[in-house]
Amino acid sequence: MKRTMFKSKIHRATVTHADLHYVGSVTVDLDLLDAANILPGEQVAIVDVTNGARLETYTIAGERGSGVIGINGPAAHLVHENDTVILITYAQMTHEEARAHEPRVVHVNQDNRVIQLGNDPAQGIIPGLLRPPFALNNPAL
């Protein structure tokens, strides 16, 4: 049996542009893709912190160091320039792989520059923001 597990995320990125008339996808700075272990063409879930919208699409590599997070195509109806988003990937793993897996969590600033790397999906970096109630720190599976 395979399990679908959280693989990586780019946390609280700022959308730099939204282009309704592009074919589709999300353009992401290659530095961010590398930091999060996300490949161009990989499926991602996008959660819009600003308005609560959720969608799935695939990544396109953006210029390295540009900070680009560009929403392309019909998703631009849901996610807009300057919205705060979380890009999430999942992977299918065996039970043994899941037990050994350490996800990649990439925290970015408002300019989409990496400010912290980690592997705890519940750990925030916003001052005063606590872990979710009852969230364990790296529990054994």
UniProtKB/Swiss-Prot annotation:
Species the sequence originates in: Paenarthrobacter aurescens (strain TC1)
Record pathway: Cofactor biosynthesis; (R)-pantothenate biosynthesis; beta-alanine from L-aspartate: step 1/1
Domain of life: Bacteria
Co-factor requirement: pyruvate
Assembly information from the UniProt record: Heterooctamer of four alpha and four beta subunits.
GO MF term list: aspartate 1-decarboxylase activity
Active-site residues, record numbering mapped to chain: S25, Y58
Stated name of the protein: Aspartate 1-decarboxylase 1
Record's subcellular location: Cytoplasm
EC number(s) given by UniProt: 4.1.1.11
Catalytic activities: L-aspartate + H(+) = beta-alanine + CO2
Family: Belongs to the PanD family.
Main EC class the enzyme belongs to: lyase
Free-text cofactor note: Binds 1 pyruvoyl group covalently per subunit.
Post-translational modification, as annotated: Is synthesized initially as an inactive proenzyme, which is activated by self-cleavage at a specific serine bond to produce a beta-subunit with a hydroxyl group at its C-terminus and an alpha-subunit with a pyruvoyl group at its N-terminus.
Cellular component annotations (GO), alphabetically ordered: cytosol
Main location per the UniProt record: cytoplasm
Reported function: Catalyzes the pyruvoyl-dependent decarboxylation of aspartate to produce beta-alanine.
GO biological process terms held by the UniProt record: alanine biosynthetic process; pantothenate biosynthetic process
